[in-house]
From Swiss-Prot:
Keywords: 2Fe-2S, Chloroplast, Electron transport, Iron, Iron-sulfur, Metal-binding, Plastid, Transport. [2Fe-2S] cluster binds at residues 40, 45, 48, 78. One of its GO terms (cellular component) is chloroplast. This is Ferredoxin. It comes from Palmaria palmata (Dulse). The keyword Iron applies.
Amino acid sequence: AVKYTVTLSTPGGVEEIEGDETTYVLDSAEDQGIDLPYSCRAGACSTCAGIVELGTVDQSDQSFLDDDQLNDSFVLTCVAYPTSDCQIKTHQEEKLY
C-alpha cells in the first residue's frame, strides 16, 4: 500500500506516524505507540473525532458526522484512511457540539 506521513496534533504535542490507505488512522497510531481517544471503533460515535488541517482522508465508512461537520473538516479517526500526507488535530469531540 502507498505510505503517507500522518501528523497528529495532540494535546501532548505533535506526533508523526506512518499511515497507508488500507489502515485506519487510529489503528496506525496505536500500532506506533500513540494512544488516541476512541469508543465504538465503528464510525458511529464522536469520541475519536479530529479535524483534518492539511491533506485528505477517506472516511466513507463513517455514519455519524453530518454534511456540515464533514464540510468543517471533522474526521472520525477510527474509520479514516489517509489518502495523502495529512495533518489531523485530535481530541476534538467537544468542538462538534
